[in-house]
């Protein structure tokens, strides 16, 4: 039986085919992305540089001599490659288990195409089993948590974690996310929220799923 890491690697290696040469690209964060950076580094493909969403990804890119650039230095990105904690059939996602979802949304929005890579366990019919990360300003944490509680969620502070921007993460369990776009907007309207981990406005254009049968390329289904 194929292990989860092997499935992640299968998806990551397939994703290299979606990277155009001589362009700037965006790189996400997480264990599946670590496999992708390794595969890209070993592929021999030449890119102008990569905008990274985390220190860990930047360090790994440097190991493979892939130039890391700031988003402020480029006018746009050809493609953004990232993983997901959950992804549905419309390629809407929950992300942010690693706490980098604000940076990830910024870089995704600057990219012409979003390619999501994941193992098959992340492909779900409905979002919400994975707790939803919400980045909050520390002084508003209790206020935001009460609002999230009123929405039907069970907020829990991520103890000992601070985001790249110095904020806190509240992980919300039990939310009804049958309308991801509406829920994403509703949470972001709460004063004190910087960003939440629903990627509906910035849904993926392509999903590469690592399965027992190999890599499957999936496009959004709105039905």
UniProtKB/Swiss-Prot annotation:
GO terms for biological process: D-ribose metabolic process; pentose-phosphate shunt, non-oxidative branch. Its EC number is 5.3.1.6. It comes from the Bacteria. GO terms for cellular component: cytosol. Transmembrane segments: none annotated. Substrate binds at residues 29-32, 82-85, 95-98, 122. The active site is at residue 104. It catalyses: aldehydo-D-ribose 5-phosphate = D-ribulose 5-phosphate. Disulfide bonds: none annotated. Pathway: Carbohydrate degradation; pentose phosphate pathway; D-ribose 5-phosphate from D-ribulose 5-phosphate (non-oxidative stage): step 1/1. It is an enzyme of class 5 (isomerase). Catalyzes the reversible conversion of ribose-5-phosphate to ribulose 5-phosphate. HAMAP family: Rib_5P_isom_A. Belongs to the ribose 5-phosphate isomerase family. Homodimer. This is Ribose-5-phosphate isomerase A. The lineage of its organism: Bacteria, Pseudomonadati, Pseudomonadota, Betaproteobacteria, Neisseriales.
């Amino acid at each position: 039986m194929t292990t989860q890491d092997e499935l992640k690697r299968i998806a990551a290696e397939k994703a290299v085919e979606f990277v155009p040469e001589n362009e700037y690209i965006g790189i996400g964060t997480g264990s599946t992305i670590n496999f992708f950076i390794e595969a890209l580094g070993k592929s021999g493909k030449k890119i102008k540089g990569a905008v990274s969403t985390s220190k860990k990804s930047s360090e790994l890119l440097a190991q493979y001599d892939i130039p890391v650039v700031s988003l402020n230095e480029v006018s746009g990105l050809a493609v953004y490659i990232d993983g997901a904690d959950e992804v549905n059939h419309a390629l809407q996602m929950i992300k942010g288990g690693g706490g980098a979802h604000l940076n990830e949304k910024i870089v995704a929005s600057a990219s012409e195409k979003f390619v999501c890579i994941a193992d098959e366990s992340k492909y779900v019919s409905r979002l919400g089993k994975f707790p939803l990360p919400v980045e909050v300003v520390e002084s508003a944490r209790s206020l935001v948590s009460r609002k999230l509680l009123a929405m039907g969620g069970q907020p829990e502070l991520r103890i000992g974690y601070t985001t790249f921007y110095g904020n806190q993460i509240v992980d919300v369990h039990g939310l009804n996310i049958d309308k991801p776009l509406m829920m994403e907007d509703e949470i972001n309207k709460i004063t004190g929220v910087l960003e939440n981990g629903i990627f509906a406005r910035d849904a993926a254009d392509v999903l590469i799923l690592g399965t027992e049968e190999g890599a499957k390329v999936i496009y959004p289904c709105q039905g």
